[in-house]
């Protein structure tokens, strides 16, 4: 098998996957290893989705990003070494993608506003079935990020920023190589996967039960705030005593009303 992170790093040009993943990606997309490793992979990637719409805008100083994407099947946000914000909408079924979605980018002093608007009567339900969104932000120019999206999966990769606030309706969140504070506002039950913890993850929920996976031996402090919130712990699918430490710089916080969070390592249940 090949991890979603490995595929995403190849799809979004944020890095060449580990060598053991290259063969898997090669067979997954029916692309030779030579083509994967050559500079020609950009043209190969275009054929990966039948339809796409790309919008780019030059960035020349650190900005605060306020982005509203509406509905999507999959949403991927990552930092990269370029100097443009790049928003790529892809679909295998919606041939009128370029006409049906308009991406508006406003540059207002220190702020970039991004708004994806559906046109021609396209519904959010259609967007959630047929459209995935890939966003790349230039790493040298990332300040704060606010991002709203309704989607099956949210993936955040290779970001170093003061804070990123996610207003989402999703059941799956992946945080891979993130440094800073991540705030997730979501009232659905979520599975949050952290490949590492370098900063703070704040989860704000009302009447929800979510799970967050962290690597074994991660040093962190767990904090509960709000009303009727609780955190429990699991290792390899078995409930266990709390295994956080006091006064760590890495924090996992649950805030909200009547919500539960399970912090777990190793294999999940089932």
Give the predicted meaning of each segment.
Residues 71, 91-93, 120, 151, ...:
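Beta-strand elements of well-folded, non-transmembrane domains
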